[in-house]
Amino acid sequence: MGVPALFRWLSNKYPKIISPVIEEQPYEVNGEQIPVDTTRPNPNGEELDNLYLDMNGIVHPCTHPEGKPPPANEQEMMLEIFNYTDRVVNMVRPRKLLMIAVDGVAPRAKMNQQRARRFRSAQEAKEADEKKEEFRKQFLKKSKGDQEIHEEVIQKTWDSNVITPGTPFMDILAASLRYWIAYKLNTDPAWEKLKIIISDATVPGEGEHKIMEFVRSQRAAPEHDPNTRHVIYGLDADLIMLGLATHEPHFRVLREDVFFQESKARTCHLCGQAGHKAEECRGQAKEKNGQFDEKGKGTSLKPFIWLNVSILREYLAVELYVPHQPFPFDLERALDDWVFMCFFVGNDFLPHLPSLDIRENGIDTLIAIWRDNIPVMGGYLTKDGHVEFKKAQLILQGLAKQEDAIFRRRRQVEEKKLANEKRRKEEAQARDRARKRRRSSPNYEPSEPPASNRARGGGGDSAPPNDVELIIPGRGELSRENRELTHSMVVNRGAVYRANMANKSAAAILKSKLMKGSQEGDDTAESTPMPDADGASDSKIEPTSPSVLGKRKAEEPEGETDTPADNTDSTPKPSKDDEMPPDTVRLWEEGYADRYYEQKFGVDPQDKEFRHKVARAYAEGLAWVLLYYFQGCPSWNWYYPYHYAPFAADFVDIGDMELSFEKGTPFKPFEQLMGVLPASSNHAIPEVFHDLMQDPESEIIDFYPEDFAVDLNGKKFAWQGVILLPFIDEKRLLAAMEKKYPLLSDDERHRNTVGREVLLLSDGHPLYQDLVANFYSKKQGAPKYTLNMRVSEGLAGRVERNETYIPHSSLVSSLEEYGMPTLEDDRSLTVNYEIPKSNHIHKSMLLRGVKFPPPALDNADIQATRSKAQHSGRSFGGAPFRGGHGNRGGRINYASDRPNPFAAHLDPNFMPPSNAGAQGMPSGWAPPVPGSANFSRGPPPPPRGNHRNHYGSGHAQQQGYQQTNYGRNDYYGRGQQGHQHQGSYGNQSGQYSGRQSGYGGAEYRGGGYQRGGYQGQGQGRDYYNSRNQGGYGRY
């Protein structure tokens, strides 16, 4: 899930990170379909090594798709999953490895969110079924028992909650994936050299984090290729941040193009047809293909897009570079800080801070505060997945100063938006009333229905009936009968129109609604993504159906939600969308913090210590999330124990926090099922546990409320609200379940065990013979075989014999009736795979020998990004930047005659670092010759566009550390030109002016960081690319 709307925000702010996927399609020759030859070079221009599939992003849309009927049964669902996966593999064409990761048991911190979503999904499915039954009864009463419709609408909504570890469905999915992979290894030549790792739902951990654990383990191997090309597919927005967290520069995220869905939905507003804009409309009627347009174009395949993490790194390198920061710029550490700041705006484990919203550019606000505080912090916020809270305290204090202004501005925007919506509705209602008055007039002359009505079935056909005589100029007069008929129609046209409107069949309307209700019910599954502001899914399982508070579908016209009666009042009624409950917290008014804690937490508004307690728990959560992204799960049992987040102003003295997490153990699959599923989904849980969920006398019956509150929390729709469910008491749950375990069947016990990853490969892979000789020869080798990375083509780890696999046995299919055959001789190999564990933490650094792709940003992109970085995120205050022609990028001058907002945070004994380089420079000193030992060391200048030496490209140590001395942060930039920056310190306190013969030609002002700034006296030269940045002069 990650940050809602992050994908749209990133693609709008950094447009070059998105590029379309070039996908070859099968073609027909003499009526025979010829598949794509994926052994040929990749049409996207680059060969890719490893493909990782976050499989839940495939399972959910295949089992309950949008825009078409769902599969009839689980067998058809498996076929849909096979076809979708095959399409993704064919477009990426990985040459070395495919990893399929299904969500297993999640950490406790994630289970709270899963519980809320599954309870909401079950409630919506129940409401959809109730609506179907109500419509069915109405229709049968009107239509006198149309059996066809009766059978069509009585089908219950498929419960997507079964896509949870431990259910029979997930057991079927795991077995089906193993069969399909083995089938492809036996039949597809493109898979011959491919290694496939399957981590199914029996292996604990979320799919994307199991993938990240694998990537980190391979990076730690001595023979790992630092230029491995990675692609990860999934619907979660946090895959972007996980890609950055790997510090693998050759990384792409693959996903469906949600913007294509929007462009497809947009039609010409004049004629209602797709394919052209209003200014291109010629008013032509829609051409039907077939008598009823049944041969029209079907649903087209959704295109895919790349999100290029390497280009995102380029953008962030420009945006996060702060001129004259008092320590060397380190892009990898800066990227970690950026990922950490994204957590404040939203993640799967913590509610976002009230003052931060991605749609209000909350990340930009944090970046601006971060840039302003870099000189004060003296270093980065994070290091290798650990937060330095003393520095984080400064960021939160900077945000706290802007909170009041943010809330007031948000209210102003909302009021303006509501006023505009009200005005548009009133104008539309006025037009409708005028139209009705015209139609009620006896002289009303209806015009030809617009093409949009014809396209939607609301008007006439594009061709007249065969028995009506056409009026064609030049062919003479009409017959007498038709002439009299035409005269009568013209004279009585108003009455004819009103009669036709009144004679519409109520049964037909009900039938239409029944069909629509059936489709809506199918879309209530939890993981059909609810489009957020970016058109993308902000979670795997956001619903698309009307919410529990009655969210109206976008395509459902207002005023048509009920079958019209003869005596329907034409007076417009206010829609449900206008009936929002009042926001009693009123964040835009004085005293909002007291009201917030009193209403949301139920505590005394004067209890300040409680606020600090919530803030410390939230800070602990931030530390947990960062470790989870960079090092793996730090604790399986930790969770944030509140439904709401604190304000930034409540983070007091968090710099003194000392955190330690107890690792713990993950839940068993049935324990997670009991922790996240509602009682209405008990069909997915073994029957022995049903009483615990349904019996009023059950010791944990309070965990399964039938009704629960949804706090809109200032939002408009229930899917945006906060689900107020009681948190699970782990000790009570496990104690109650322990009594039932002896009653489980053998099959149920098998589903409740912890599984292992499996590795599959074909007999054409070089590793095949080694493994067969070790495990299946007469002279067997060690039970655990350590892979030789040269033979395995880059795969590190250990493997063991899989007890269920028999070499060259038959590959049995359970889908033979669907065209998936049983193979008599299975030539693939299956072994258990163990991801290698490292004794060292994952370092935020580039690996030795990495080679960067050519820069994607040109000089215009860099200048635009730098300009935005200097001014964005400052809508609500904050330290300003100097503007003007001669002051580009200059910092504000905190001298003796100006207050320094950072002074309150400084140690009274703080002294700026000495500059030994300035003291040893003789008069007339010149910079070293390019290529000499001390040339171009220290922080690099901002990137210079498409220059061939951009960020030191072409040298083995680009953007990286000196490998033998991690932490020193020395950069080797021999590829860069030496841009001299000659600057003499002025006499004014705390600033210097300079002439530049090199980069930028801009004047920089000094950034003194004690209360009165520093005084730079005397002469000195500041050489931008020297090891030390000029001199501070005499303090």
Curated annotation (Swiss-Prot):
Residues 406-434 form a coiled coil. This is 5'-3' exoribonuclease 2. One of its GO terms (molecular function) is RNA binding. Residues 564-573, 955-967 have a biased composition (Polar residues). InterPro entries: 5_3_exoribonuclease (IPR027073), Xrn1_helical (IPR041412), Xrn1_N (IPR004859), Xrn2/3/4 (IPR017151), Znf_CCHC (IPR001878). Residues 417-432 have a biased composition (Basic and acidic residues). The keyword Phosphoprotein does not apply. Signal peptide: none annotated. The lineage of its organism: Eukaryota, Fungi, Dikarya, Ascomycota, Pezizomycotina. It is found in: Nucleus. Keywords: Coiled coil, Exonuclease, Hydrolase, Metal-binding, mRNA processing, Nuclease, Nucleus, rRNA processing, Transcription, Transcription regulation, Transcription termination, Zinc, Zinc-finger. Gene3D superfamilies: 1.25.40.1050, 3.40.50.12390.
